[in-house]
Amino acid sequence: MPLPGFTKSDFETFLIDGLEERMAAIRSNIQPKFQVIGAELRDELSTLLGNEMFLHIAQHARRTTNPPNDTWLAVAGNKRGYKKHPHFQVGLFDDHLFIWLAFIYELPEKGNIAKTFLENKPLIEEVVPSDYVVSIDHTKKEANPLSELDLTQSLERFRDVKKAEWLVGRHFAKGSETVENGEQLMEAIRQTVKTLLPLYQLSLTAGAPTR
């Protein structure tokens, strides 16, 4: 399968009513594309890092009533799961595609990672372009450009609030050429991940488990 992009019909998946119906569309339309894109990303990250990385595709298994408003793939250094580990995500809401370096609330070392990031704030500001965005909740669409964000406040919240999260990356609007053209999309993913790789590696020095 050639590198796929995501079309209008893929985004319309999130307009389908009913958990089973929406999940059926996610499995048939979106997850095969995630498999191809994710395998490419997994292999490239394994080469860049010199460690085996693993692809995970969100199954939304905990849901019993409400259908998911977004779906994603994740690449992490752990074979069994990704939520307790720093990881990269590529996924869709109904109006945009996101590429994240994600630190979500299940991460046991999030306090140490936040502390390390606060101590290395100048590095973050140097490495991450100002038009990249930060989210403090992976379940919400909202994200703020780094240039408009109080970085210290967001990292202190990540450190101090049990359910707080910190994700950094890029958004691309549905219908954009980058999203619909598979080669362009993969190049955008590569560029984003390479840009954020120093932060991923820094998080590992804070005691985050990789296996």
Curated annotation (Swiss-Prot):
UniProt cross-references to InterPro entries, sorted A to Z: UPF0637, UPF0637_domain_sf
Domain of life: Bacteria
Pfam families: DUF1054
Family, as annotated: Belongs to the UPF0637 family.
Protein name: UPF0637 protein ABC2405
Source organism (scientific name): Shouchella clausii (strain KSM-K16)
